[in-house]
Amino acid sequence: LGLHRLKQQGALMPQKERLSVIGSEQHRALARKAADKFVTLVKDTRNYLPIRPDEHRRIRLFFLSGDGKVIAGKLMKDDSHKVKEHFIQALEKEGFIVEESEQTEKGKMEEFKKKYDLCLVVINLIGFAQYNTIRMKWKQPVEQPWYVSEVPTVFVSLNFTNHLIDIPMAKAYINAYVNS
């Protein structure tokens, strides 16, 4: 690669004044544009999408988050609670009624079906460069998607692209790549 020569020529790293563009508003705008543009619909075998308040007004939100992320050997807390609140606010702003709480018991399927028009499972599991995959871990058995055959269910992965292997029963799956 000739990195040693570039270093000798002073061309390996940009000059300090050229580094000032990193994190600039222009770069942040480009990042937002890329994040919006590259969301991928992986599958929608039952035509659940798009979701609309007139058809899917009552949404049951299931939000899966991890333990944080490891950077330089240190466990860092993630911002899952903020991401979850953002999802709820955005859905409510569009006219949806969103219910989200930890589920401790399954209950009766008929009651669940009467109560919700759609289930939205948001997967915000975050890793870092040392992981090439993060497997989904359900905190309790009742959190597993037992309802997918009865209630339209859309899964959205916010970070890793390979969660579908853990939820083969998913009829609708979206990769969003980032949680912003």
Language model features by range: what are they?
Residues 1-180:
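Preference for extracellular/luminal or secreted protein segments
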